[in-house]
Amino acid sequence: MSILHDLAATIEARKGADPDSSWTAKLLAKGPEKCAEKFGEEAIEAIIEAVKGDRAKLVSEGADVLYHFLVMLAARDVALDDVLAELAHRQGQSGIAEKAARPKG
């Protein structure tokens, strides 16, 4: 099991936890929209560090992005394995060809 699977399992376990005792539970209790908003904030912070070229801060923000992505998935009951299966499906395809094959609209 990977660290991402371990983290996803921990997040899933915190769904029913007391929001006063867990940051993850507190975030999940605010609903999927807030989880998505927080993911977006963290993604922007990672972008800023990437542009600045600060490797250490980018690594830290990257970890935040991954955590908040997993929280956002959990808030919508989407399993990490579903996302990984989609990546596996796309593996070996040209990104251009994959994008062109997506349904329009």
Curated annotation (Swiss-Prot):
One of its GO terms (biological process) is L-histidine biosynthetic process. Keywords: Amino-acid biosynthesis, ATP-binding, Cytoplasm, Histidine biosynthesis, Hydrolase, Nucleotide-binding. InterPro entries: HisE, PRib-ATP_PPHydrolase-like. Gene3D superfamilies: MazG-like (1.10.287.1080). It catalyses: 1-(5-phospho-beta-D-ribosyl)-ATP + H2O = 1-(5-phospho-beta-D-ribosyl)-5'-AMP + diphosphate + H(+). GO terms for molecular function: ATP binding; phosphoribosyl-ATP diphosphatase activity. It comes from the Bacteria. GO terms for cellular component: cytoplasm. Its EC number is 3.6.1.31. The keyword Calcium does not apply. It is found in: Cytoplasm. Pathway: Amino-acid biosynthesis; L-histidine biosynthesis; L-histidine from 5-phospho-alpha-D-ribose 1-diphosphate: step 2/9. SUPFAM superfamilies: all-alpha NTP pyrophosphatases (SSF101386). PANTHER family: HISTIDINE BIOSYNTHESIS BIFUNCTIONAL PROTEIN, HISTIDINE BIOSYNTHESIS BIFUNCTIONAL PROTEIN HISIE. Belongs to the PRA-PH family. NCBIfam families: histidine_hisI, PRK00400.1-3, PRK00400.1-5. This is Phosphoribosyl-ATP pyrophosphatase. It comes from Ruegeria pomeroyi (strain ATCC 700808 / DSM 15171 / DSS-3) (Silicibacter pomeroyi). The lineage of its organism: Bacteria, Pseudomonadati, Pseudomonadota, Alphaproteobacteria, Rhodobacterales.
